[in-house]
Swiss-Prot record:
Protein name: Porphobilinogen deaminase
EC numbers for this chain: 2.5.1.61
Organism: Legionella pneumophila (strain Paris)
PROSITE patterns (UniProt xref): PORPHOBILINOGEN_DEAM
Keyword Transferase (UniProt): yes
Length: 309
């Protein structure tokens, strides 16, 4: 690798900076003489945090400015939470590495109640995710869902102020920030299936930048990448945005088989369509397509058409 400085585009939130520094540390461990700088940026998603992402434009708002920095060569690579990535990337950009996946599950945080089952009737639960909202209401229709936005510390502060009885956050973000002690319950995946790629960091770069791709190749975790790309394939075929209550989770079983589960719900959780597929690892794309076709046959697109755009 040449002596040039490598620039990593990242959001400015504390979690995003932690993630970018984590990738920098892994790169320097592999390439000790590498010079790396962070290029922190405020994205459209950060500016819209107080608004509904549904009306503002969805999850792609958290990566748009970072991708522009890649395309105009102000940055050499960008670090993202893969769950924030749109199903379709801009021409000229690729996901060159999926880092080893951290905790993919959702966490209940409550100062008073130790589990979902302990929450009282009409308890106010904070989340901005339609996926979490619909699955919470499917499990307990007596809960009250209230929008919760901001970075991790802001959300925890709102909980502590008494605005909510409990909030739901991604466990991985809390663990990365040293805030795992706030977790009251890891929500079982039979109650709340994760979103596409939750818990996985990805590294995006220019498709034609073979030097950078070689640099970050060692950070790619093959199993995590297989599972994430399988989830993203289903997500893309079902519309590929955060406007829909859709969950998908892929794992490798003890028997070395690929297990893929997905579900689509309406907003109040009263209707749900789910599917489970299993097969050989080398048939991941076939399994993803089979899962998608099964969901569609069961009426997933009709159910999704009831979700306001």
């Amino acid at each position: 690798m040449s002596a040039k400085i490598i620039r990593i585009a990242t959001r400015q939130s504390p979690l995003a900076l932690w993630q970018a520094n984590h990738v920098r540390e892994m790169l320097v461990k592999q390439w000790p003489n590498l010079s790396i700088e962070l290029l922190p940026m405020i994205t459209s998603g950060d500016r819209f945090l107080k608004d509904k992402l549904l009306s503002a434009g969805g999850k792609g708002l958290f990566v748009k400015e970072l991708e522009e920095a890649l395309l105009d060569k102000r940055a050499d690579l960008a670090v993202h939470s893969t769950k924030d990535m749109p199903a379709q990337l801009p021409d000229g950009l690729s996901l060159a590495a999926i880092c080893k996946r951290d905790n993919p599950f959702d966490a209940l945080i409550s100062p008073r109640f130790k589990s979902l089952d302990a929450l009282p009737k009409n308890a106010i639960i904070g989340t901005s995710s339609l996926r979490r909202q619909s699955q919470l209401l499917a499990y307990n229709p007596n809960l009250q869902i209230k929008t919760l936005r901001g970075n991790i510390h802001t959300r925890l502060s709102k909980l502590e102020s008494g605005e909510y009885q409990a909030i739901i956050l991604a466990a991985a973000g809390l663990e990365r920030m040293g805030l795992a002690h706030h977790i009251t319950q890891l929500i079982p995946d039979d109650i709340m299936l994760p979103t596409c790629a939750q818990g996985a960091l990805c590294i995006e770069c220019r498709t034609d930048d073979l030097e950078i791709q070689e640099l970050i190749h060692g950070l790619n975790d093959p199993i995590s990448a297989l599972c994430v790309h399988t989830e993203r394939r289903v997500n893309a075929k079902l519309g590929g945005n955060c406007h829909i209550p859709f969950a998908v989770y892929c794992t490798i079983t003890a028997e070395k088989l690929l297990l893929l589960r997905a579900k689509v719900l309406n907003l109040d959780g009263s209707q749900m369509i789910d599917d489970e597929q299993q097969g050989k690892i080398e048939e991941a794309e076939i399994i993803a397509d089979r899962c998608t076709e099964s969901l569609m046959t069961k009426g997933a697109m009709s159910l999704l058409s009831t979700i306001p755009s």
